[in-house]
């Protein structure tokens, strides 16, 4: 029984296909596009049209950017703007502020 990605079998089915190695699935191509290995323009030049996938890739990359920001804040602490914002938010209490200053009258 031939292997799943046998060279002879794939060459006889599609002579213009990539003969060496495995042929990437749509899911793999999506991942590689997201990671920057391919560009939609270069794939279109080769004859691969993934216009319907482009929207999904854009949405997924935006989600990854927001995840990366929160991950960076967790790993490396807050950014300078975040630290400044937290520093400026001092809520008064009955016995003064959190910093110990007398309450404003």
Swiss-Prot record:
One of its GO terms (cellular component) is nucleolus. This is Uncharacterized protein C2D10.19c. It comes from the Eukaryota. The keyword Cell wall biogenesis/degradation does not apply. Keywords: Nucleus. It is found in: Nucleus, Nucleolus. Belongs to the ALB1 family. Its main location: nucleus. Residues 1-11 have a biased composition (Basic residues). GO terms for biological process: ribosomal large subunit biogenesis. Residues 1-20 are annotated as: Disordered.
